[in-house]
């Protein structure tokens, strides 16, 4: 069927082509005829125009002028339209650019709006959470306010009870002091009775009585070197004395032949050295402390003795009568050191990180100084001002104070915590012992370190080890953990001598005292022993 259609189409196409070839000559003839006819008609029109040209010439000129004017109007309108088109295109371009800018800004604002909406949603959620938390906190606040009011009332009650207890304790302490003084008075009366009995017996022998009288009044001759105005280095041990039932924490010469010791047995013992310097006998015991005694001090007349104790108090005794005069309580931790200050005050430093200034007559605290670090030692009578004192601390600092100010006037930092202080005779230099096994000599006037003293075998015993000046300040000395005493020349820092107080290295030296006469060195240790070197 497909082949028949193809052959039919080819047949038609062939016939058309044949017809085209046959009629091509006739077609050319008709075409030429049409051209000749058009030329003839054009010739006739030319003639008619030339005949009528003169009749219509005027009309044509008028029409031509009108047409020119119309053409000019058209051109003017065209020029105006072109300019309007240019302006319109420019405005369109500006509008499109503004549209594009506005579209971009719109997109940015849309993005920012979406972000703000999201942020608002988050903030609304946070606000709801905060409101809920605030409600909970407010509820807790109301509860805490109620609790605080209750605790405040309870604190007020406890403070009242505390004041009552303090008053009761003070009354009991006063009664205890009265009982102790009564006991001491009784002991004195007994001693006087014994003395009267001895005097009665001594009247039988006049020579023996004369000897005892001369011994009592100290008329026996002394060697010239007792009154030498220079310090003599110790060369031999005169005696070793067991002075306490525990560690001996401090020792002080009260006079050329009398010294006091403080121990862990809560007692202060007064001793007198024999005339031949080979022994010492107990004169009296100052009791009343409820804990180990740490430091001793005395007035210039040697009439009163001040002791600081681990029972958080300081106590003041009359040395002659052994009466307990005052108890200064107010610290919340052990009192490391206390000194008689000015003429009627006591200055004390404690492990509770405070220093207190006490009035002796009223037994009350005049001022508290908040230090912020454990106080190890205090010295007074320093510098040119009577209101100055110096303290040593756990935080490696030596602080200089004026009692009239609440803050330290200056501080000097050393290499380690500062265990003890000692002031020179003129009050212008202070000797500081620190746990880095060195001694530092500090000028009180400009706070500068003048000298450092150290030795290879010297090791600081503990946090309460005491270093001192000799009586004239010619030497500085300190006890070591190996039972030795190291003595340096103050000016040259030369190690002049090392003396050993015990064969065992376990007898750590706690404190030293140089005799006011210049001859005689006392050293106390942790083995209950006090040793005299001369």
UniProtKB/Swiss-Prot annotation:
<dbReference type="InterPro" id="IPR045160">
    <property type="entry name" value="ATG16"/>
</dbReference>
<dbReference type="InterPro" id="IPR036322">
    <property type="entry name" value="WD40_repeat_dom_sf"/>
</dbReference>
<keyword id="KW-0677">Repeat</keyword>
<keyword id="KW-0072">Autophagy</keyword>
<dbReference type="InterPro" id="IPR020472">
    <property type="entry name" value="G-protein_beta_WD-40_rep"/>
</dbReference>
<feature type="repeat" description="WD 1">
    <location>
        <begin position="243"/>
        <end position="281"/>
    </location>
</feature>
<dbReference type="Pfam" id="PF00400">
    <property type="entry name" value="WD40"/>
</dbReference>
<feature type="repeat" description="WD 4">
    <location>
        <begin position="371"/>
        <end position="411"/>
    </location>
</feature>
<dbReference type="GO" id="GO:0043495">
    <property type="term" value="F:protein-membrane adaptor activity"/>
</dbReference>
<dbReference type="GO" id="GO:0035973">
    <property type="term" value="P:aggrephagy"/>
</dbReference>
<dbReference type="GO" id="GO:0036093">
    <property type="term" value="P:germ cell proliferation"/>
</dbReference>
<comment type="function">
    <text>Most likely a component of the atg-5-atg-12-atg-16.1/atg-16.2 complex, which is recruited to the preautophagosomal membrane and associates with lgg-2 to promote autophagosome formation. Plays a role in the recruitment of lipidated lgg-1 probably to the autophagosome membrane to promote autophagosome formation. Furthermore, association with atg-5 is required for the nucleation of lgg-1 positive autophagosomes. Although its role in autophagosome formation may be distinct to the role of atg-16.2, it functions in a partially redundant manner with atg-16.1 to regulate autophagic processes.</text>
</comment>
<dbReference type="GO" id="GO:0005886">
    <property type="term" value="C:plasma membrane"/>
</dbReference>
<keyword id="KW-0853">WD repeat</keyword>
<feature type="repeat" description="WD 2">
    <location>
        <begin position="288"/>
        <end position="329"/>
    </location>
</feature>
<dbReference type="GO" id="GO:0034274">
    <property type="term" value="C:Atg12-Atg5-Atg16 complex"/>
</dbReference>
<dbReference type="GO" id="GO:0042078">
    <property type="term" value="P:germ-line stem cell division"/>
</dbReference>
<dbReference type="GO" id="GO:0000045">
    <property type="term" value="P:autophagosome assembly"/>
</dbReference>
<dbReference type="InterPro" id="IPR019775">
    <property type="entry name" value="WD40_repeat_CS"/>
</dbReference>
<feature type="repeat" description="WD 6">
    <location>
        <begin position="459"/>
        <end position="498"/>
    </location>
</feature>
<feature type="repeat" description="WD 3">
    <location>
        <begin position="330"/>
        <end position="368"/>
    </location>
</feature>
<keyword id="KW-1003">Cell membrane</keyword>
<keyword id="KW-0963">Cytoplasm</keyword>
<dbReference type="GO" id="GO:0000421">
    <property type="term" value="C:autophagosome membrane"/>
</dbReference>
<dbReference type="InterPro" id="IPR015943">
    <property type="entry name" value="WD40/YVTN_repeat-like_dom_sf"/>
</dbReference>
<comment type="subunit">
    <text>Homodimer (via N-terminus). Most likely a component of a complex at least containing atg-5, lgg-3, atg-16.1 and/or atg-16.2. Interacts (via N-terminus) with atg-16.1 (via N-terminus). Interacts (via N-terminus) with atg-5. Interacts (via WD 5-6 repeats) with lgg-2; the interaction is direct.</text>
</comment>
<feature type="repeat" description="WD 7">
    <location>
        <begin position="504"/>
        <end position="534"/>
    </location>
</feature>
<protein>
    <recommendedName>
        <fullName>Autophagic-related protein 16.2</fullName>
    </recommendedName>
</protein>
<dbReference type="GO" id="GO:0050830">
    <property type="term" value="P:defense response to Gram-positive bacterium"/>
</dbReference>
<comment type="similarity">
    <text>Belongs to the WD repeat tipD family.</text>
</comment>
<dbReference type="GO" id="GO:0006914">
    <property type="term" value="P:autophagy"/>
</dbReference>
<dbReference type="InterPro" id="IPR001680">
    <property type="entry name" value="WD40_rpt"/>
</dbReference>
<dbReference type="GO" id="GO:0016236">
    <property type="term" value="P:macroautophagy"/>
</dbReference>
<dbReference type="GO" id="GO:0005737">
    <property type="term" value="C:cytoplasm"/>
</dbReference>
<dbReference type="GO" id="GO:0034045">
    <property type="term" value="C:phagophore assembly site membrane"/>
</dbReference>
<keyword id="KW-0472">Membrane</keyword>
<feature type="repeat" description="WD 5">
    <location>
        <begin position="413"/>
        <end position="452"/>
    </location>
</feature>
